[in-house]
Amino acid sequence: MLKDSFSSASVFMGLSLLLLALVLFGASQGALKISFDALFDEEYRDIWLNIRLPRVLLAVLVGAALATAGVIMQGLFRNPMADPGLLGVSSGSALMVGVAIVLPFSFPVVLVLYEQMVFAIAGSLVVCTVIFLITQRHRDGSMMQLLLAGIAINALCGAAIGILSYIGDEQQLRQLTLWMMGNLGQAQWPTLLVASSFILPAIMATTCLAGTLNLLQLGDEEAHYLGVNVKRKRQQLLLISSLLVGAAVSVSGIIGFIGLVIPHLIRMTTGANHRWLIPCSALAGACLLLMADTLARTLVQPAEMPVGLLTSLLGGPYFMWLILRNRRIT
């Protein structure tokens, strides 16, 4: 046990140092490279502080949020294939953001910054609830049934987004397209502050529920006998995962597979104890998305690739390998 804790702590420290290095490196890269010495120049310092740093920190937040949501969903459904993108949760959030973009809604000035986030969280909460009800109704349902439900939800949300694209104007269509591919180019300090006000408390709340997630892996009856209010804790976890996915999608669009890939990789190194799995997954998700976004900004300069394309290129093959691996096991 002590050896396992030491190993997990080493992984946590290593990921923390890697994230710090990636933040410093990512903030210096782009069409205009900014060295440490250049920060003494006012023009370069303004670019670094108001353009580069908010984007880098937003990538950290979104990556951590998606990875943490993946840990919650895999623990909540006790299914290694559970992921915000595959189950349609991200699509539900994106659909509601599309509704906020295309259809006219009037919000008080104080709530304008929160408009898309409120819609995105509502969309993710609805989809999470539907998936949860499906799993509760068919407790003996297979992994394939869960994936088929996700495919159906993704298809419905995709069709609805297509309708919104059809009735929207040219500017709204462009905004929706960027949203569907995943993009962090709109990062600003106000956006970062709004996102962090949802994501950071949700990650901390998830960490506090790590013991509950460990007990839920034993099954609902066993967890109940050990003193867990299963229904209430599942509702809390469902709400937290909806907050994480909704807040992430509202500022970045759909970025897939981080919630699938990262928990699996971290579980291989730290084991299934959620007390280490949650914080290490959050750090690893932040590292992965930050690396992907840095590549997206530098591969085709001066243009930028949508970061969602890069994460899909990574996650797609991993997902196929995971399906083949589980088929061989069964």
Language-model features: locations:
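Alpha-helical transmembrane segments in inner-membrane proteins
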Residues: M1-T330
